[in-house]
């Protein structure tokens, strides 16, 4: 069993923002692979389904970004999941818009959602880093990541490719995964 966590913030004011790209990708995986609708739990939304004969759980923490580790730890502990079977999808301002990197372990690089997860389960889980870039104007990074994509349609094809090919990452074939989405 694998757990795919999409990071973001709950609420309509955060929809289609840079910081919510994890939610957007997880929603697209859910739709592409015909999972059931998300169910609301205390501090997260969850659904499950099958991708290439493997059971997959998708969650969207609803505890706000800075507390994402709480629901992730609950699920990891309940299902006794190995960190090898956890993938966290998150925005990365250090990567250009549309660049993707797959990484296991490492630091949070200042990302508060990752800091929270690290504090609860450690940092040796998989990350799918989705580049959102940095502001080209005078806005602070915080204001930028909480702003909506100016041209979301430019990001949509990449999100769809990730959803379609996520099974390769879950199988450990990160090279094929990256080659098919870029």
UniProtKB/Swiss-Prot annotation:
Active site as annotated: 19
Family, per entry: Belongs to the PTH family.
EC number(s) from the headed UniProt entry: 3.1.1.29
GO molecular function, one term: tRNA binding
Subunit structure: Monomer.
Binding-site residues for tRNA, renumbered to this chain: 14, 64, 66, 112
CDD domains recorded: PTH
Keyword tRNA-binding included in the entry's annotation: yes
Protein's name in the database: Peptidyl-tRNA hydrolase
Function of the protein: Hydrolyzes ribosome-free peptidyl-tRNAs (with 1 or more amino acids incorporated), which drop off the ribosome during protein synthesis, or as a result of ribosome stalling. Catalyzes the release of premature peptidyl moieties from peptidyl-tRNA molecules trapped in stalled 50S ribosomal subunits, and thus maintains levels of free tRNAs and 50S ribosomes.
Alphabetic keyword roster: Cytoplasm, Hydrolase, RNA-binding, tRNA-binding
Gene responsible for this protein: pth
GO biological process: protein quality control for misfolded or incompletely synthesized proteins; rescue of stalled ribosome
The organism of origin for this protein: Wolbachia pipientis wMel
PROSITE patterns, sorted: PEPT_TRNA_HYDROL_2
UniProt catalytic activity: an N-acyl-L-alpha-aminoacyl-tRNA + H2O = an N-acyl-L-amino acid + a tRNA + H(+)
Site location (Stabilizes the basic form of H active site to accept a proton): 91
Annotated positions for site Discriminates between blocked and unblocked aminoacyl-tRNA: 9
Subcellular location as annotated: Cytoplasm
């Amino acid at each position: 069993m694998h757990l795919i966590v999409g990071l973001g913030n709950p609420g309509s004011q955060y929809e289609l923002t840079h910081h919510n790209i994890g939610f957007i990708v997880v929603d697209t995986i859910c739709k592409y692979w015909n999972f059931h609708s998300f169910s609301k739990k205390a501090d997260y939304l969850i659904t499950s389904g099958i991708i290439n004969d493997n059971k997959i759980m998708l969650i969207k923490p609803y505890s706000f970004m800075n507390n994402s580790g709480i629901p992730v730890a609950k699920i990891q502990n309940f299902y006794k999941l190995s960190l090898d079977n956890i993938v966290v999808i998150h925005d990365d301002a250090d990567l250009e818009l549309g660049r993707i990197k797959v990484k296991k372990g490492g630091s949070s690089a200042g990302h508060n959602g990752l800091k929270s997860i690290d504090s609860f389960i450690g940092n040796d889980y998989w990350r799918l880093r989705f580049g959102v870039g940095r502001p080209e104007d005078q806005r602070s990074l915080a204001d930028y990541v909480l702003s909506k994509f100016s041209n979301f349609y430019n990001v949509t094809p990449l999100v769809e490719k990730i959803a379609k090919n996520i099974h390769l990452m879950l199988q450990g074939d990160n090279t094929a995964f990256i080659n098919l989405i870029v």
